Amino acid sequence: PSFAPKSASETLKPTPAPAAPKAAEQTSDIEQEIKELDSIAKMMESTFDKPQNKEPSKPQSAQELKFVRILYKTLLDNEVDEKYINQILDEIEKFLRPGNSLDVILSNVYQKLILRFGQPETIKVNGKKPRVVFFVGPTGVGKTTTIAKIASKFKVNYNKNIAFITADTYRIAATDQLRTFANILDTPLSVIYTATELNSAVAEYEQADVIFVDTAGFSHKNETQRNDMRALLAGLSPEYEKSVYLVLSATTKYRDLISIIDSYKDIDDYKLIFTKLDETSSYGNLLNIKLYSDAGISYVTNGQNVPDDIEVFDTQKIVKQLLGGRQ
């Protein structure tokens, strides 16, 4: 069943519409809505941060239903796809019975969201050969800067031996940008122009722990560049461990994100990185794309500063924000 708020005809007794609502009445309705939402937010924060403070009160079924509809609206306002909201709320329907507290309902929604996101899948270094990490994605999402942030962590924080390869020869600025980062980190950089050059470039860095490969950003509508990217990924020798990270912007429209994901559907086992979280207040697309692609989210970025403005995806933090928690 859908948990979307019912229409007025379904939820309210018919009453004559006033010719002109009084300002005081309108203000009262708004204030009441604010109070309800604030009450929900406070209870959410209490549930997340202090789950054992006190025994929760037992609501009536009407309160439960209203609470679920507020949860529905909160997720919808965060741009979670309606079909995913209904799937989650369908699963917790069994908890909507007398005697269950609002905390129980909220806790189950919270857990369902946590399970759907799963755990972050970050870059692992565990072999004798270098791990070759490809970063792919559309133009303008901050792919090269993201590479620099992660590479800086491996070099400075984890004391790993790293190298750069760029196959992004469509944009001179991208190569220059990565070369600047390579110079700052005192890290070697190779530029390749075709997929056939990849293995010889990787072989030059046999002593590296991680080799970061920057690829050309392109429109998902550009079939030629898509084929070039596929050839590059397929061209790596199987003796090397490979990881692929699809970099997406959290500010991109949902419909466009779906088209981008569809254009990468023939790539096996890629992970997701979302950039520009600082430029949006709605995080629903992170859940939407995770569920649509079935790819794990690894990192998120929240600014331009290298290497600071990146972190491993924090599932609990994002879920709290999706449920109306304060950032």
Task: Locate each region found by the language model.
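Hydrophobic positions on the alpha1 helix immediately C-terminal to the Walker A/P-loop
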Residues: T146, I150, Q177
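Short beta-strand-centered segment that lines the nucleotide-binding/catalytic pocket of NTP-utilizing
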Residues: N157-A173, V191-T196, T301-N302
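Hydrophobic anchor at the beta1->P-loop junction of P-loop NTPases
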Residues: V133-F135
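Conserved catalytic-core segment of NTP-binding enzymes
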Residues: Q177, I184, T194-E204, V210, ...
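Walker A (P-loop) phosphate-binding loop of P-loop NTPases
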Residues: G140
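Non-catalytic terminal/linker segments enriched in charged/polar, low-complexity residues
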Residues: P1-R116, E121
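Phosphate-binding P-loop
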Residues: I123-P130
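Conserved lysine of the Walker
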Residues: K143
